[in-house]
Amino acid sequence: MAQAYWQCYPWLVLLCACAWSYPEPKYLGREDVRNCSTSPERLPVTAVNTTMRLAALRQQMETWNLSAYIIPDTDAHMSEYIGKPDKRREWISGFTGSAGTAVVTMGKAAVWTDSRYWTQAERQMDCNWELHKEVSISSIVAWILAEVPDGQNVGFDPFLFSVDSWKNYDQGFQDSSRHLLSVTTNLVDVAWGSERPPVPSQPIYALPKEFTGSTWQEKVSAVRSYMEHHAKTPTGVLLSALDETAWLFNLRSSDIPYNPFFYSYALLTNSSIRLFVNKSRFSLETLQYLNTNCTLPMCVQLEDYSQVRDSVKAYASGDVKILIGVSYTTYGVYEVIPKEKLVTDTYSPVMLIKAVKNSKEQALLKSSHVRDAVAVIQYLVWLEKNVPKGTVDEFSGAEYIDELRRNENFSSGPSFETISASGLNAALAHYSPTKELHRKLSSDEMYLVDSGGQYWDGTTDITRTVHWGTPTAFQKEAYTRVLMGNIDLSRLVFPAATSGRVIEAFARRALWEVGLNYGHGTGHGIGNFLCVHEWPVGFQYNNIAMAKGMFTSIEPGYYHDGEFGIRLEDVALVVEAKTKYPGDYLTFELVSFVPYDRNLIDVRLLSPEQLQYLNRYYQTIRENVGPELQRRQLLEEFAWLEQHTEPLSARAPHIISWTSLWVASALAILSWSS
């Protein structure tokens, strides 16, 4: 799944500083977006009335003597996906986009979001809200300074601000006479009242031993060893990200959409283990699993989730040093640790240790990808039969591939919202259809499906782009060049400890040669029944160096605005490279096992090395997925796989007829019965 990155250079900040608006002229006259320039104002049926919500929040602001209140789109753990109780910006503004910040003053309200969501915001917000289109913290601060008088307070919930975000806001207000005030009571929650969705209370369970790479005791020992050998010898480490506690204790639940996590913190010291969580969610069996009935170094002491700030403050009063990973720690716990007792790294030891999978974890992830490939192949076969009938749309397609995954063994649902995009919608890198808004799939258009699953043995993420008709020469070239980029990076041999950003350009080279490019990241880490976007692995500037045992996606793309989009994404394991001469070198081994669309490949563009690599990959797909299809007697899918993984050559035909598929199916049946 592609991850976008947005940045604004200094000159652009100056240009955009005042780039806020009510609906632009291009929206006027449209009934699907708001028009605040008329009297009375015209709102679409999708707009949310926020007048009473804002009044309730402003009443709380008055109680706390605040002239402005900042509402980010995060939770207390800096999660990528957030639960319903944490969708505070969505509730107060009506805007449901995944990225954006709201600020409310006593007289105005504004939302900042990027270009992916501008139209959506105009459809969902009423005229109480301004829409700002420059998303930097500096632009938010500039607006607040213009709206809030000297000497007034600007409030925020410290549990919703990362350490770095707080520093940026604090720096912005330093030279002004406004005061940035930490308020641990969330005022939106108070205004929301009884209508706020309850915090989940489903059971927290321990993963069966066969689905874990190490026991939780072994993991705790590894983290303590890391602390012991750390240059600043911390006595404890605070874990704030939800995947950290889930991984450390081999525990899972369902508090967060698409992620098997539960609200929690952990404070691990040399001699104790504290897990901050809702204790009522554990069964007696799980309590015994965690050794909660003792106080020895390998016993887990359960404390209430809400007590983490006070407990960390109490621990910090002793002769201690506390290590935190600032990327996922909020200011809410950071501010109670004296600076002389604080040890800061970008990432916690848990983040670094779990990034490198051991041999069992590698085997588990691979097995999940084999079953996942079966589901994707079933989907592609189904599409080939049904799209020409005109019976499939983007939304029904997304529902069907999710259903196919749910039917797989050890499935726990999708790993993110399926991106099912036809034609021009595929040019939007993060488009997802809805029941109300979607396009019908057509044999005359390209179709992009980016999807993934959560299984007890692994998390998956794969993107394929297909065309069932006659693609244009440009579409074939663009697709082939995206494929060339995928191959060039996947087959690359590089020195150990190389940063992903150093080699990322290999995925873009074939596109750059003809003046094409893409605007999202090239890849991200992936977990074992954890995050589909698992930091700190990947190809961006703030990712750690590549190491044997890491998993990353490789996903170049190309997006032709208003016409089509292409992305080819595979998950790869970092392995030792076999080189002619001795040396410490690495390469990638793909664990996604679904062939690319032969109808879109211009083999003439591929080098002999690229073609050889592609054919070897196809042989690997046959060896890994073929037996599973045969075992399940999925005859049609097996025939499809055999046809679509036939070796390619410069003169090989690329289009496969359904007649040939049925012939292959018959031959497969005969071979099994003999």
UniProtKB/Swiss-Prot annotation:
Q: What is its EC number?
A: 3.4.11.9
Please give the cofactor(s) recorded in the UniProt entry for this protein.
Zn(2+)
Sites where the protein binds substrate: R116, H430, H524, H533, E555
A GO biological process of this protein is: proteolysis
What GO CC terms are in its UniProt record? extracellular exosome; plasma membrane; side of membrane
The record describes its post-translational modification as: N-glycosylated.
What chemistry does it catalyse, as a reaction equation?
Release of any N-terminal amino acid, including proline, that is linked to proline, even from a dipeptide or tripeptide
Q: Which residues bind Zn(2+) 1?
A: D450, D461, E569
The reply on keyword Disulfide bond is no
List, in alphabetical order, the Gene Ontology terms for molecular function in this entry.
Answer: metal ion binding; metalloaminopeptidase activity
Propeptide, residue positions: 651-674
Tissue expression, per UniProt?
A: Strongly expressed in small intestine, heart and lung. Also detected in testis, skeletal muscle, spleen, liver, kidney, brain, uterus, eye, lymph node, thymus, stomach, prostate and bone marrow.
InterPro entries assigned: Creatin/AminoP/Spt16_N, Creatinase/aminopeptidase-like, Creatinase_N, Pept_M24, Pept_M24B, Peptidase_M24_C, Peptidase_M24B_aminopep-P_CS, X-Pro_aminopeptidase_P
Q: Where is the lipid attached (GPI-anchor amidated alanine)?
A: A650
Instruction: Tell me where the signal peptide lies.
Output: 1-22
This protein's membrane topology, according to the annotation, is: Lipid-anchor; GPI-anchor
Spell out the Pfam families in the cross-references.
Creatinase_N (PF01321), Creatinase_N_2 (PF16189), Peptidase_M24 (PF00557), Peptidase_M24_C (PF16188)
Show the CDD domains listed in the entry.
Answer: APP (cd01085)
Would you list which residues are glycosylated? N65, N270, N278, N293
Which key words are in the record? Answer: Aminopeptidase, Cell membrane, Glycoprotein, GPI-anchor, Hydrolase, Lipoprotein, Membrane, Metal-binding, Protease, Signal, Zinc
Quaternary structure, per UniProt, is: Homotrimer.
Family assignment from sequence similarity: Belongs to the peptidase M24B family.
Q: What protein am I looking at?
A: Xaa-Pro aminopeptidase 2
**UniProt source species:** Mus musculus
User: Taxonomically, what lineage is the organism?
Assistant: Eukaryota, Metazoa, Chordata, Craniata, Vertebrata
